[in-house]
Amino acid sequence: MALLEVCGAPRGLRKACAVPALGSQLRSDPGHYSFSLRAPELAVPRGMQPTEFFQSLGENGEKNIRKEMVHGTTTLAFKFQHGVIVAVDSRATAGNYISSSRVNKVIEINPSLLGTMSGCAADCQYWERLLAKECRLYYLRNGERISVSAASKLLSNMVYQYRGMDLSMGSMICGWDKKGPGLYYVDQNGTRLSGNMFSTGSGSTYAYGVMDSGYQPSLSPEEAYELGRRAITYATHRDSYSGGIINMYHMKEDGWVKVESTDVNELLHQYQEANQ
């Protein structure tokens, strides 16, 4: 309330955002998103809907205004006979501005689960960290780690509650459970897909081109590492919004290991020299 008063907010908005009494049933915490518990609540102050807010920004009374966020990345994950390979670039952009070249776009949920970031970094980090909390609570309640399928379904259910509210997220959930290696794609609308190979981001089309020419389920670990390197390297070469270093992880039966962090410019130079 004090902050709203300092900012000169209208009195009506101050009342709408007032903190309820302790006895009130309204909550300010995000709650738990377990399958059998109450509906989720996001920890944001009550106020106008995002769509109404964006409409107020329109010029000359323009309606249905939509703020487009420009972002780019290249993330890749694929299953093979020895587990799951996850390879990502590290460039973060704000429009045409390169804000960072050292962002780790792999979120380590627990020793047997990994998540990737594609879209708005804040959305991906928030929801996957919340997923990590719920996976930890599941382990404490049940004495065993959550399955890859259940973890991806939990993330899908969480973001589905906020579809149409301009979230921007395309994540892959990778892990190993009793059924073996698992790989799922989840986006901001709650879409959930299972598959052997996914690539997301502005450089994904280039990564798919390399993957389609060399992917086989029977690859050895070293062959899989090299395929992941080439896919991300050539994607960053053609996509100006991707670059930096390649962070590569290998999900094994006993948990994930980080394989390497390699500069894409060095790899591209090596590949070009080898082709001459």
UniProtKB/Swiss-Prot annotation:
Matching Pfam families: Proteasome
EC number assigned by the record: 3.4.25.1
Gene name linked to the record: PSMB8
Post-translational modification (record): Autocleaved. The resulting N-terminal Thr residue of the mature subunit is responsible for the nucleophile proteolytic activity.
Residues spanning the membrane: none
Main location: cytoplasm
Site positions for Cleavage: G72, T73
Subunit structure as annotated in this protein's UniProt entry: The 26S proteasome consists of a 20S proteasome core and two 19S regulatory subunits. The 20S proteasome core is composed of 28 subunits that are arranged in four stacked rings, resulting in a barrel-shaped structure. The two end rings are each formed by seven alpha subunits, and the two central rings are each formed by seven beta subunits. The catalytic chamber with the active sites is on the inside of the barrel. Component of the immunoproteasome, where it displaces the equivalent housekeeping subunit PSMB5.
Active site (catalytic residues): T73 (nucleophile)
GO cellular component: cytosol; nucleus; proteasome core complex; proteasome core complex, beta-subunit complex; spermatoproteasome complex
Name of the protein in its database record: Proteasome subunit beta type-8
Signal sequence residues: none
Function: The proteasome is a multicatalytic proteinase complex which is characterized by its ability to cleave peptides with Arg, Phe, Tyr, Leu, and Glu adjacent to the leaving group at neutral or slightly basic pH. The proteasome has an ATP-dependent proteolytic activity. This subunit is involved in antigen processing to generate class I binding peptides. May participate in the generation of spliced peptides resulting from the ligation of two separate proteasomal cleavage products that are not contiguous in the parental protein. Required for adipocyte differentiation.
Biological source species: Canis lupus familiaris
Keywords: Cytoplasm, Differentiation, Hydrolase, Immunity, Nucleus, Protease, Proteasome, Threonine protease, Zymogen
Species classification: Eukaryota, Metazoa, Chordata, Craniata, Vertebrata
Induction: Up-regulated by interferon gamma (at protein level).
Family: Belongs to the peptidase T1B family.
Catalytic activity: Cleavage of peptide bonds with very broad specificity
Protein localization: Cytoplasm; Nucleus
Source domain of life: Eukaryota
One Gene Ontology term of the molecular function aspect: threonine-type endopeptidase activity
InterPro entries according to UniProt: Ntn_hydrolases_N, Pept_T1A_subB, Proteasome_bsu_CS, Proteasome_sua/b, Proteasome_suB-type
